[in-house]
């Protein structure tokens, strides 16, 4: 009914039409080349890091495939192999907590011994992020309960995402009906930051009222925000995907969307990706402009590399980019300690330490 009314209003007066728009990268999100000029930390194409954390000792720990690895002085060591794809990581004192697809939450002690923490069905799939509260409670975001694949959930406008409270082996759903909550982080004062990917929004919610909509910290972002990590002067937010006008147009047309999903294989859908290995064969090339075979950095990206920092006042203070003409894309995790930043570029299949100069 709403769709019919909208179509009728647009027919009567085109100026009444309301369509999705993509805001520009500006102010704190002004494009730069800090990821492109940063340092790669892993051997090329040997890993596909999903998340990363930095311990108090400065040791870098990351997840890739079914394992957890450490990186010390350029040497990568496998810590443990788990029973499924390892995603989000969390440091909790002298142990680690990992989300394992098909299993749930697993703890890994200092000796690398893994023990099941919570194997509740709510945590068995699509855990996107974890955070630890001061009282020892773990909060987990579930991207989707019904459609655990990101691109399929996007075109379905899925709203089955949840926040789950984990106390030992007990799990309790404390928020539901969310549009792909991709990140959560303790913000102090009894609050957490939550990123809502399909709403292009980061918001602050009270721990005692996680089921209620919170105050926007960043809204109508030009990206789909993901995992969040605390730093000394705010929070870093990973943005695995950037929005583009082609996809937004598609999402405004349900009939066209249904035809696409029914007639085109999923890897060719006109939606953002973590990486775009051969952009020259992309259908319609998403409107990208090429001169002499060169992709321009300002073109509509199918894949993009970005993390941005929100300061204590809730403003986007800085960001690091890898633009459309590069390949250091698909940033799924970020960690910061003592001024050092390390990002997990799953699309690029490496860990990156961004260039420090924000003017580049």
Predicted regions mapped to residue ranges:
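A short beta-strand motif characteristic of beta-propeller blades
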Residues: 37-44, 74-81, 113-120, 170-175, ...
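Short, conserved, GDST-rich strand-edge loop motifs in beta-rich repeat architectures
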Residues: 140-158, 240-302, 353-354
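A short helix->beta-strand "capping" segment at the edge of beta-propeller domains
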Residues: 7-8, 18-48, 73-75, 306-323
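Residue position within the beta-strands of beta-propeller blades
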Residues: 62-63, 98-99, 139-141, 193-195, ...
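Beta-rich, blade/repeat-based domains predominating
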Residues: 45-55, 83-95, 122-137, 145-146, ...
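Short loop/turn segments that connect beta-strands within beta-propeller blades
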Residues: 71-75, 109-113, 166-170, 206-210, ...
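Blade-level signature of beta-propeller repeat domains, shared across WD40, Kelch, NHL, RCC1
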Residues: 242, 330-360
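Asp-box/WD-like beta-propeller blade repeats and closely related beta-sheet repeat scaffolds
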Residues: 99-133, 140-161, 175
